[in-house]
Structure formats: structure tokens, C-alpha cells
Amino acid sequence: MTTAHIDAEYQANAIESQIQNDWENRKAFKVADTVEGKHRYILSMFPYPSGKLHMGHVRNYTIGDVISRFYRLKGETVLQPMGWDAFGLPAENAAIAHQVAPAKWTFENIAYMRDQLKKLGLSIDWDREFATCTPEYYHWEQWLFVQLYKKGLIYRKLSTVNWDPVDQTVLANEQVENGRGWRSGALVEKRDIPMYYFRITDYAQELLDDLDTLKDGWPQQVLTMQRNWIGRSTGMDITFPSANPEIYADGLTVYTTRADTLMGVTYVAVAAEHPMALKAAENNPELAAFIEECRMGSVAEADLATAEKKGMATGLFVKHPVTGEEVPVWIANYVLMSYGSGAVMAVPAHDERDFEFANKFNLPIKQVIDAKAADDAEYSVTAWQEWYGSKEGTLVNSGEFDGLEFQAAFDAFLAKLEPQGLANSKVQFRLRDWGVSRQRYWGCPIPMINCDSCGQVPVPEEQLPVVLPTDVVPDGSGNPLNKMPEFYETTCPSCGGHARRETDTLDTFVESSWYYARYASPDFTGGMVKPEAAQSWLPVNQYIGGVEHAILHLLYARFFHKLMRDEGVVQGNEPFTNLLTQGMVLADTFYRESESGKKTWFNPADIILERDEKGRIVSAKYSGDGQDVVIGGQEKMSKSKNNGIDPQAIIDQYGADTARVFMMFAAPPDQSLEWSDAGVEGANRFLKRVWRLATGFLEKGYAQAPIAAELSKDAQDLRRKTHETIQKVGDDIERRHAFNTAIAALMELLNATSKFEVQTADDAAVAREAIETLLTLLAPFAPHLSQTLLAEFGIDLIAAQFPSVDESALTRNTQTIVVQVNGKLRGKLEVSVEISKDELLAQAKALPEIQQFLTGPTKKEIVVPNKLVNLVV
């Protein structure tokens, strides 16, 4: 008989809701703002409340939960919080589509998604939950903004943006499709508008240097991406004096990391907005029209790299700083005014963009670097890559500088030009200051006031927060705050005169740059974080999220930590000690293509599949009409490909524990996971077997007893397997994050325990230890099942400890020896680990299955200690 209150069959849904209620009633995962003893902060990137969880969320939060539950078993106090990244454009777009206030849409989504997360069985302290769209949260973001503005770390300047004249709004680059607004279809204009910027460049060197302190805890790939994004380079500012001082007196100063190519300059390119270009266009309508065309183009650096090269000669010239020769000045659409000085020296022989441009406009190409240091190298269309790609070449065609290599040439040009005031050495960063103004309604109000007399004045601290009105239903025609005098009309804090409140809101990356710190004391009303809570919990010990956040979010959060440190809010230099970037979740795609080439995508749930004996899909039909669909292969789950699997459907059918085990078993966490219905069923079968093993053992009613000193060989083997599994699972979770191999080890322990026959009370004690260990080690992955079954063994999972390894159980008294004849396996022996070589050979030869092969004389006897005997006859 099973115990009175437990089913013989695994009923996931019944036990999961019961266990979740137990956790809620006991506040099982609540922690204090300050904590003594060993403690740890585990954080998964918080979700945007889009309305429904997707499988990427399930993977992210299950990884965080496995790590959290593991450390709780290890006796540590673990903070694992959850909240909502709640501002942003999708809420505004949904509000426009459904004619509902973004606040209402957002909070309804939060309620639904919170319920979904709870059903996943996450060990979260829900008392710390917050949404970033509440004044209690963004009050302190505004407070920090004011402090930074006063210190000069935030400034305002004109910036070129994409303007939709119909919607009266600014568009992000990705919202411009073929030059038109994605919603209105109107031709997009370029406008210069004032925007606020964070001086992240002031921290560029520190952001770069501190990456070295993360090398043991962050993936190398992420560190490299951040290094490249910050992009420190040592180069030279070189001035080309004006050859037309009567028109444009100032020379052109360019920054280059390749001063060694100076003698290969055949033209200088400037941005369309460069003062020299504007001066040249004053009496040149054609040039003025070209400048306007460039201004209308994309402002994204990535687009410029791939866009068609466009240019026009200004008719002005500068003098080469070494030779004094006149060099033409061209306007080129690949030069950005916002980068460096807005001018570049063009060396077509050794730079791809310059080469394409020179070819298009028939400008000279002069080779000045050659790997072979030969003057007679033929220039070819493809050779520039070879010449430019390496700094190991030698200067040619460079007059007095011929024969010099990169560093020597750099030093020689500097020595020649610096005394004339035409050059100086300079460190530059690719990183640009962070523009945070958004001409949107659903965001954190920027706490600034515009006064005609006083200019920009920060809102006094006692008047914070500036609260965003939440009963607004936007209609898509610009920022509704601009039509609300009750919001923007105010008085100037400096002069008391009539003034206008800033109606731009902050980039939502600002909220996600400091939320991790707020979790330490979410209800604190005296500042961003309670000092003693920050002292207790920060930095985050383990951060988990997608690699797509490697640059922006993680860089901004690192920047904010340093800003908060310098305001005395937090200590330490970095927010996240360890980072785990989980891979994508992939699923099969299915579609039909119309004659026009338009694809209609079908959800995998609506597809009837036929598979071959190896499980591969051979045909697919849409269940709606029974007709074939095209099998598109596996791609990242997405709305656009309609290949998302609803986590709720999996939880309803199999239970959260099955979903969790599948997600952790299907692939290492940092690699892509291929969704597989068969894999989900396999995870469910595994849990059913665990359930049957445990309930079957309980049914027998064995009395509890200590492990005996003397055990049968089978019992010794099972104990060894049990303690090897403790060792492996502990290492796999803590050090390697190899959750898939940890589960594989639990499957092996399940197999070994299932095969073990209990014949004595001592055997029962060993089996009980194996089952209790299996359930405890499984708890981070399948907490509902584990807690339910452990309770039947008299163990409360919430108070349970990770099992400790009994070293004596790992030692082997016997070993299995393979016996070969002429290199072929013919038998096996179980012998003492201390057996002598002679005794081993004697026992091997005495095996009946071996003797039949020993008819002739034995030529050779090979013994590999602890492994095999090979008899050559």
C-alpha cells in the first residue's frame, strides 16, 4: 500500500498547485533587507510585460531558479527577486491599437504573467516585486538625473533625428522602412531637436579597465563585444591647412589610427554638416541639394557601412601637411559629423570604404605600404585588404619615410609635424555619449523645466517625483503630454516666472540600468537603495540573461553602478560578479508561399507530422485543411515565424516540473536549445519513473535504519553510485553550470536504484539513502515532485540540506577486469583491488569461458593494472 495521502500515479497538476500554495503560505523564499551569514543574490533579467511568457522566459527563469535552489540547499540565504520592465513603446502601440491607457494594458499583462511565473514554481521573494512605471520607482531615477545634471554628467544638445511629419513623432532607425514611417507611411524628415545626454564617455576608460576584473565570471565573448564597443584607439590628430583661406580659413583636423598611411592620402572626406561643406555650398545650389539629400539619409552607423557610397567635390582644397600638395575635399555620405571631427583622411589603397569611393569617382589610389617593402608591387583591386589588414608592412612611395614600419612611421610623422602644430598623439574611444531623450508618452518624465529667462532648470528635489499622468489614451499623433497644459505648465524654480515642463521621457534602458539595486530594498523611501541593504546584497553574485543584451543593457548597467557609487549610493565598481548568457530556444517552422512570394507561417501546434524510424520529419500537413506545408527548419521562436510554443500549454499538459527538466536537460544553458515534443515526453517519463520508484519503496514499509558497516557488493555499488552522483551534480550545477549532465547523472542513479533488489534491512537502508539523495538532488530542477515525495520520507525540502559526500563510500574494494584472448573480449573478472599480478593471471586463465581458447602455448601475457588481461596464444 502507498501512504494514505499520496497517489501511486504521478499527478503533476494536483501536487504543483498544492506545493505552490504551501510556499506562499510559509513565505518560503522571503529574505530580509540585511542578512548575516552566507548569502547570495541570483538575478535573471526582468521581463517586459508583453502579455504572455514565452519559452525564452521559461529557460531564463528556470536557470536562475535551479542555481537559487541549489544554494539554498547548501545552507545559504538566497535573494531571487522579480519585477517588470514596464515602460516602453510596445505598450504605447498596443494602447493605440486597443484604445486603452498604456498603464491599464501594462498592469493587466503583469497580473497574467505573474500568475504564469508562479505556476513555473520559481523560488522568488514576491514581496520585492515592483514595476518600473510606478512613481515609487522612477522617483529615484529622477533624483539621480538631477544630481548628475548638477555635476555636468548630463547635458543638452541638438541632435539629428528621424521625424514623422504625420504622426508628429520621432522614430528610431528601425521604425523607418524604405525612408517612410512604419505606422503612417509618411516620408521621414531629418530634424535637429534638443536632447539630453549622459556623459558615458567620461567613464570610457574605467568601463574598459574594469572588464579585466570580470574575466573569471563573464563569458569571454561578452567581454570582447564590450571592449570593441568602447573601442579605445591610440592615434593622431593631423591638421591639413586650408588651401583656400579666403573662403575657409580653418584647416581640417582628422583623427587616424593609421598615421603610417599619411603619404597615401589622395582626398579628404567631410560629413555633409561639416562647416567647410556648408561654407562651400553657400553659392553652389547643386552642393546644397546634395548636403540636404545626405541629411535625409539614415543616422545609423551600421546603415552607413553598407549604404551606397555617395559624394560630391566641394571645390575646396587643403594642403598635405608633409608635402604641401593640394588635396581635394569631398563630401561623403559615409562620414558622420558626430564621429570625431566629421572629417577623415582618405587612403584608398589601404581602406575599403575609401577604395570603393575612389573607384566610383575616379580619384587617385596610391599604395604606401607593402609587406615585401618593394616599390614595384602591382596594385590590384583585392590587394588593399592584404596591405591594410596588417600593421606589419613597410612604407613605400613615402619619400624620406620609406622603409619604416608602423610604430617607427607613427613616431617619425609625429616628430616632424608636432613642432609645426600640425599633429598630436591622441587616445580616442568609439563609445559615444548616451542620448536618453525620447519623444514618447509612456516613459519616465525627464525632471527638467524650460524657462525663457533661466534656460534649463532641474526640478527641485522636494518636488520629485514628476508624476506621469496614467489615464491617457494616446492616438499615435505625437506625444500626448504636449497637448496637456495641466502637465507642462509650471513655474520656474529659479525666477518664479512662467515656465514649461520637459515633455520628453527617458530611454527605457535607464530603468533597467539600476533595477538590480532597487531589489535590495524596494520599499525604501529615503533614496535609491537603503545603504545597509546595498551593503548586504550587492553586487549581484549571478546574473542570467540573453547574449543579445551583451552590449547596451550590460554596459549601461555597469555605467550606472559607477554613477551610483560616485553618489555614495552603492559600493564596489561592478554590478554583476558572474554572468551566464543563455542560448536561444529554437523550434520547427512551417509555411506556405503564395505566388507573389509572401509566406504564411503556421504554428507547430497546428501541424500534423509524419516521421521516419529515426524521428526525422518527412511530411507536414496543416490540421486546418489536411494539405501539405513546407518544412522550414528550426529557427528562434518568434512571432514573425509563428513558431512559439505556449509554455502554459506544456504546463497544463505535463506540469511545470516536466517543462523545467526538459529545458535544463535538452542543451547546455549557453547553447541554443532545440524544442522537441519527444524530449518533453521523455522528461515526463523520467519524472514518472522517479515517482514510481519512491512510492514503490514507501509501499513496502521498510523500517528506517542506519547504513551498516558491512554491505553486500551490490549495496556497496549503489552507495558508491549515490555518492558519485552527489559529487557530480554539485560540481555540474555550481562550477560548470552543466545542468544537462547533472540531470543525466540523476537518470543514471535512477536506473541503478531501480535495478537494485532489496533483500535485507541493510539493503533497504542503502536504497532509502539513494532515493532520498535522488529526490534532494532533483529538487532544484523539479521542486514540486521532490518536495511532495521527500515529505513522505519525513524530510521538509525547504529546510533540507544538500547531501554531503561520504568519501568512504567512494572507495572500491573490488574492480572489474576485462579478459581478452588475442585482443578480443572473452570474459570479465571481479577481483580485489589488492590482487597480485600472478593471482590475477591465474584467475583469468581459470575462467571456463577463457579455457576453451587456451589450447596452444601462451606466447605473451599482458596485464594493464586495474583494467585488463590480454593472453596472446
Swiss-Prot record:
A motif ('KMSKS' region) lies at residues 636-640. Keywords: Aminoacyl-tRNA synthetase, ATP-binding, Cytoplasm, Ligase, Nucleotide-binding, Protein biosynthesis. It catalyses: tRNA(Leu) + L-leucine + ATP = L-leucyl-tRNA(Leu) + AMP + diphosphate. ATP binds at K639. HAMAP family: Leu_tRNA_synth_B. GO terms for biological process: leucyl-tRNA aminoacylation. This is Leucine--tRNA ligase. It is found in: Cytoplasm. InterPro entries: aa-tRNA-synth_I_CS (IPR001412), aa-tRNA-synth_Ia (IPR002300), Leu-tRNA-ligase (IPR002302), Leu_tRNA-synth_edit (IPR025709), M/V/L/I-tRNA-synth_anticd-bd (IPR013155), Methionyl/Leucyl_tRNA_Synth (IPR015413), Rossmann-like_a/b/a_fold (IPR014729), tRNAsynth_Ia_anticodon-bd (IPR009080). It holds the Pfam family tRNA-synt_1g. It comes from the Bacteria. One of its GO terms (cellular component) is cytosol. PANTHER family: LEUCINE--TRNA LIGASE, MITOCHONDRIAL, LEUCYL-TRNA SYNTHETASE. The gene is leuS. Its main location: cytoplasm. A motif ('HIGH' region) lies at residues 47-57.
